[in-house]
């Protein structure tokens, strides 16, 4: 069985999805990672874990149609070459372009992760409004297929996608986050006395 995990940036994969890839590898999958070309140290880390890396020219903020078409062609070529059984797309562009490429190739199980809708859906102004409408249209055209399964991390996003007729409700599930490796982050005893709490997060 072959699995491809597709993300914008390799550092994001290493910080958020590496344990999933290792679990799939240990379960017997041949695991491939596709992302924007990164540092040699990050690629070496994948090699040590016996994960195969494939550079894809993702540009997170690009709106250049030729560049975006090039990215789509690269994904389509990669899927034809590897013939994966499952593709797992994470973040907006991998979800949209990866799903489209996988549907063109044929019988591939498609699992998309929508961890949040991001800043675009709360930003004000006419530019943000237009971009949001275009993104929702793209989601509806590309994701509205019985071949596609979607993971959400909160019910509000699932409801929004359902209201805009983007998804098949029976092809979705809600998970409570990307997960924490408890072998690496071990539970510590609660200190006595008055504690201090630090939140390290991006507030939207």
Which residue stretches match the model-derived regions?
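Membrane-proximal helix-turn-helix segments that form the acceptor-binding/catalytic region
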Residues: 22-27, 73-76, 129-151
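Short His-centered aromatic/hydrophobic patch
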Residues: 89-95, 114
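Conserved donor-binding/catalytic core segment of Leloir-type glycosyltransferases
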Residues: 177-179, 189-204
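Active-site proximal beta-strand in glycosyltransferases
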Residues: 2-4, 103-121, 149-151, 173
């Amino acid at each position: 069985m072959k699995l491809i995990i597709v993300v914008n940036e390799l550092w994001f994969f290493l910080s958020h999805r590496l344990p999933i890839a290792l679990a799939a590898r240990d379960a017997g999958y041949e695991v491939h990672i596709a992302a924007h070309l990164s540092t040699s140290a990050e690629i070496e880390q994948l090699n040590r874990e016996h994960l195969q890396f494939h550079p894809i020219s993702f540009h997170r903020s690009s709106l250049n149609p030729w560049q975006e078409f090039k990215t789509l062609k690269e994904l389509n070529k990669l899927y034809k070459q590897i013939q994966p059984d499952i593709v797992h797309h994470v973040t907006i562009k991998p979800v949209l372009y990866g799903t489209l490429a996988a549907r063109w190739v044929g019988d591939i199980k498609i699992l998309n992760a929508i961890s949040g809708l991001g800043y675009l859906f709360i930003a004000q102004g006419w530019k943000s409004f237009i971009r949001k409408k275009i993104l929702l249209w793209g989601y509806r055209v590309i994701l509205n297929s019985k071949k596609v399964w979607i993971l959400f991390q909160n019910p509000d996003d699932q409801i929004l996608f359902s209201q805009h007729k983007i998804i098949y409700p029976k092809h979705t599930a809600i998970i409570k986050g990307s997960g924490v490796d408890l072998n690496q982050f071990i539970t510590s005893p609660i200190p006595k006395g008055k504690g201090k709490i630090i939140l390290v997060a991006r507030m939207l």
